């Protein structure tokens, strides 16, 4: 007894990350008309999907200027393994492998397995032989968890994680998240103006 509106939305218009997610909303027929769900709301979702296809947010907009990024550097062994893995897949005609960030473009998708080796999103720093992972702050920004947005929802110090959480746990939480600004935009259609 429900009507469904759905869309695949890429978050790169809101945050500097290619992150395509399926958004499916179900409306009970007793409370919402087919006209609202299948026309008005579906058109609204389609416009968000189109925005995600046509607009980009560059990574440079959130890139850390922090002086101490050494702790995020991957090891030489991990870097060698990632390069070997990518070369093997390129040779076989497949596109698997690590991804280096281009500051002018959105990154690849941050996944829950990111803490393992950071392969999806690696950042080259000048004069470094090996790249680094994103910082926790960059991870928060990559998902749209910025201080301005956090304060809007009552988080006085912005979005933070408990100090007892490891970086691996934080990356996993971020990798499993949705971009809150997209959810907020979807919910905005229900707010009476």
Task: Describe each PLM feature range.
Residues 74-193:
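C-terminal target-recognition/interaction regions appended to catalytic cores
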Residues 1-109, 113-115:
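Class I S-adenosyl-L-methionine
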């Amino acid at each position: 007894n429900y009507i469904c509106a759905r869309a695949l939305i890429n978050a790169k218009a809101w945050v500097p990350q290619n992150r395509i997610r399926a958004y499916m909303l179900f409306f009970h027929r007793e409370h919402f008309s087919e006209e609202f769900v299948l026309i008005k709301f579906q058109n609204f979702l389609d416009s968000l999907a189109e925005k995600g296809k046509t607009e980009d947010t560059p990574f440079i907009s959130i890139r850390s200027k922090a002086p101490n990024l050494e702790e995020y550097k991957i090891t030489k062994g991990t870097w060698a393994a990632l390069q070997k893995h990518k070369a093997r897949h390129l040779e076989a005609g497949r596109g698997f492998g690590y991804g280096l960030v281009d500051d002018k473009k959105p990154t690849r998708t941050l996944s829950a397995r990111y803490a393992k080796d950071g392969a999806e999103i690696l950042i080259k720093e000048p004069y470094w032989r090996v790249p680094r992972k994103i910082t926790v702050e960059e991870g928060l920004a990559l998902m749209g968890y910025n201080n301005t947005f956090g304060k809007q929802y009552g988080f006085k110090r912005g979005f933070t994680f408990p100090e007892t959480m490891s970086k691996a746990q934080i990356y996993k939480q971020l990798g499993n998240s949705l971009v809150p600004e997209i959810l907020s935009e979807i919910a905005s259609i229900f707010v009476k103006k």
